[in-house]
Every structure is written in C-alpha cells, then in structure tokens.
C-alpha cells in the first residue's frame, strides 16, 4: 500500500540540456502538468515550487514558468516546439532529414554568412532567431512575478565561474530580472553557438559545467514535515550503449557520458547528505529544548528539507526497461540525434517522453496516495 496523501504537495522539476533531445522533455512535461491537474483537488494544495534547467532544458523551463497557468504552459510548449520543428518532404531519407539542421533551424539558429572572415570565427551559427522565439513563446512578466522558482545556469567564458540566473533572491544572491538573453545564455553551446553577452559579460552553455542543476531545485522546497515534496528529474542520456563504430558515434557517446554522468554522481552525493541530515535530526531530538542559540536551532530544523533527496524521481527518457513496460518498441537514437529537429524525430520523442513520464509519475503519485491505485 502507498502512503496516506498529505494536503500540501510541492513539486520541483529539473531539466537537462541535450539539443533536439529536449523534445523528450517536452512530452514528459506535458504528462506531468496533466497529472498535476488530476491531483489538484479541493482541500489539497499542489504547488510547482521550482523549475531549473540548462540549455534546451532552460528554454523548456521558461515556457513552463513564463505562463499564466498549467494550461497556458502546455499551449506555450506546443507552440515553441512547432516552431523548432523542421518539416521535410516525405520522400527524404532519415539521414537527410536529420542533417538538414546543419543548415539552420529558422526559429533557433542560422549559419553565419561572413565566410570571408572565417579564420576569425569563434562560432558557426547566429542564435539571434532564438531571442525572437523566446519573446514570442515566454511571458517574461509572468516568469519574473511567478511564485515558482526559476533557475537557469550559464558559464562566464572569461572567469570560468558558473552563473545562476534566478527569478527569486536566494541567500546572498539577488534576483535577476529574467529576459530572453538569460535563457539563451544557458543554451549558448560552443563552438556551434556564440557566447551571449549580458551586461558586458560573455556566457556559454551552463551544461559545460553542470548539466543537471539539482541543488537549485532542492533549495526551493520548504522544510515543513507536513508537506509532501517530490522532485522530478528528466534524464535524457543513456548510461550504457554499444561501442562506437565511427567518429560521429564517438563524439555522441562522449556527450552522453559528459552530460549524463553528473546526475548519477549527484545521486550518490545525495545519499551522503541524507545520512548527515538524519544524524542532525537524531541529535536535535535528544538536545533539551531552548538549550541552543535560536539561529542554530533554526538551522537544524531547516536541515530537514534536504531529505527531499530521498524523493528524487528520475524520469529516465532513455531507459529500455521503462520503454518496454510502456509498451514502446526499444529504440536507440542514431548518431547526430542532438541536432535532429525533423518533424518525425520531434513527434517520436514527444510521444515517448509523454508515455514514459505518464507511466513513471502515475505510479509515483499512486505511491504517495495522490491517485487511486490500479
């Protein structure tokens, strides 16, 4: 049997970068928002407390938080991905459809044309089109005023420091008035894309340093024991795969390991933190009330919110076992998948993401007593 449902539910979402693989996240987010509608019943408060993202995950996150409500978020995501989809003739073979993005994605990026200056290039594409796309599909007034914490990351090219652009103040960090450039900066992956300048500082894609901004989402949760805290992490990358057979596959596998392994390391770190929190709670239970300085006592109580790490739920969008359970054919992304914005690929990924997330999250919500068990 699952646990008894609590009356207050906090949900956080972490979105990875991965180029066109972000269509998996698109489908998964739609499923999550629909299930949130299903559990949001009278007498229960369901809150989306945080959405953090990197690169294409930052763009998806902006559509969710930069919306008036869950219905509006779904509409904005669908409109965004319609614009990012490349329509190709039906008689084209898959490889040609995939590689068409090398010539640009009109709502995202276009090739540089100053070929006479090629020896001074530091990037291959112009990302100005994405600024217009973000302005069209994200309500930045709603995003900046939202109660949902929004955090995206980017790397200061010169200093190497990881910058966080957030719509809420946090500790000593002031809030940022989020605009299209902050979101674009999080997705400015070299050498394809140029650095994005903000206030005289040039930024590259935050995924270079950390492709899964887990901690920023965790810190948005409350420390109350009366709240059911659920953190959903969208994982785009396979842990295991057959040996690469050519240089393109080598590069793709390198990206999978580079961008996917950090999440697994964070989970191991999370287990250690949980043990420390458990120790703090046990100490707090035997220390006489009022014997600690108020500030220290408050910090010990606040430590409880980090136990949310026990409730991290990976929606592994590349898990063959989960795909089999969902009744989906086992498939493997071919080389160059990160740039495949063709209509067939986007629809397939959306549909897979939706089905896998719906299956995984439906079970999760049943276990938390939020939905009736089947």
What are these regions (language model features)?
Residues 113, 117, 131-136, 141-226, ...:
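Active-site gating loop/helix substructures
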Residues 152-159, 210, 235-240, 305, ...:
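Glycine-rich beta-alpha junction loops
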Residues 245-287:
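Acidic, Ser/Thr-rich peripheral helices and adjacent loops at domain boundaries
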Residues 6-12, 20-122, 128, 134, ...:
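Patatin-like phospholipase
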Residues 1-14, 154-160:
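Small-residue-rich anion-binding loops in enzyme active sites
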Residues 226-246:
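A short, conserved beta-to-alpha structural element at the edge of catalytic cores
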Residues 12-15, 47-55, 151-154, 231-236, ...:
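Extended hydrophobic secondary-structure segments that form protein cores and membrane-embedded regions
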Residues 275-374:
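C-terminal helical/tail subdomains of lipid-metabolizing enzymes
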């Amino acid at each position: 049997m699952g646990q008894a449902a609590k009356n207050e539910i906090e949900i956080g979402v972490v979105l990875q970068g991965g180029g066109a693989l972000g269509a998996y996240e698109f489908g998964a987010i739609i499923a999550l928002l629909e299930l949130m509608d299903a559990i949001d019943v009278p007498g229960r408060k369901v809150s989306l407390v945080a959405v953090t993202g990197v690169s294409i995950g930052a763009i998806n996150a902006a559509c969710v938080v930069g919306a008036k409500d869950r219905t509006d978020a779904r509409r904005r995501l669908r409109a965004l991905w319609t614009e990012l989809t490349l329509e190709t003739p039906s008689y084209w073979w898959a490889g040609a459809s995939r590689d068409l993005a090398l010539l640009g994605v009109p709502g995202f990026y276009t090739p540089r044309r100053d070929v006479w200056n090629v020896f001074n290039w530091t990037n291959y594409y112009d990302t100005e089109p994405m600024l217009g796309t973000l302005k069209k599909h994200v309500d930045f007034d709603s995003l900046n005023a939202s109660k949902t914490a929004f955090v995206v990351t980017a790397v200061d090219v010169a200093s190497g420091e990881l910058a966080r652009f957030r719509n809420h103040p946090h500790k000593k960090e002031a809030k940022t008035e989020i605009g299209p450039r902050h979101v674009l900066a999080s997705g400015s992956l070299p050498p394809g894309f140029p650095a994005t300048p903000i206030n005289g500082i040039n930024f590259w894609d935050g995924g270079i340093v950390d492709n899964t901004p887990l901690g920023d989402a965790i810190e948005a949760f409350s420390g109350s024991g009366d709240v059911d805290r659920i953190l959903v992490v969208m994982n785009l990358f396979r842990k295991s795969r057959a040996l690469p057979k050519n240089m393109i596959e080598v590069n793709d596998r390198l990206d999978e390991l580079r961008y996917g392994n950090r999440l697994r390391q964070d989970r191991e770190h999370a287990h250690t933190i949980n043990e420390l929190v458990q120790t703090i709670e046990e100490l707090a239970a035997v220390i006489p009330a009022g014997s600690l300085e108020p500030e220290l006592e408050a910090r010990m109580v606040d430590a409880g919110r980090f136990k949310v790490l026990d409730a991290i739920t990976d929606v592994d969008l590349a898990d063959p076992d989960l795909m089999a359970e969902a009744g989906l054919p086992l498939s493997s992304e071919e080389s160059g998948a990160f740039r495949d914005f063709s209509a067939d690929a986007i629809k397939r990924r959306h549909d897979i993401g939706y089905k896998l997330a719906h299956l995984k999250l439906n079970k999760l919500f049943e276990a938390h007593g939020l939905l009736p068990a089947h």
